[in-house]
Amino acid sequence: AKAAEIIRRAMAGLGLAPERARIALCAPSQSAALEAAARELSKDVRYLALCAPNGERLARTLRWDCGASVHTLQTDERIAADLSVCFDDFPLPDGLVLPLGSGAVSVAYGTENLGDAAMIWNEDQLICALYASLARRADEIWVKDVKMPPDGGENANLP
C-alpha cells in the first residue's frame, strides 16, 4: 500500500519532478501493489509506463478514468525511463532502478506520538509492531526516507 509513497520519496531524493519524469513500473505479473502504485502515480506523474503482462488493460483504465499518459512496454522492450521501479523478481533493466521486491531498498517510516518508546526501540520496528497490533493505521504512517541500493561498482560500506 506504500509503494507509491516510496516511489515518490525516491523520486524526490533523485531530483525527479513528477511533471517531467518518465517512470516505468515493471513486474513479472499483475499484482495489487503494481495496480495501486500505477493508480496513485498516474495522478501526478506525467509519463508513466507499465511493463507487465496484460498491462494494456490497466493502462487503458488509467487513461479512461484519470486521463493519464500511460503506455505499455513489452517485457523484452528496452526501457527508457528516468527511474524503473521493479516489483518482485523482475529482471533489472539498464539505468536507474528502484528494486522494490528485492529487499535492497532501505525505507524509513514515521508516525506521530511514539513517546519514550522511540528512545528505547528501533523506530521502524516499533512502527511495524504498532501497525501489526492495529495500534496504528496505514494512513497514520508515512515514508520518511528511501535509500537506493548502491550501484554495482560502489561499496555500500563506505560513507
Language model segments and positions:
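Adenosine-phosphate binding glycine-rich loop
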Residues: 99-159
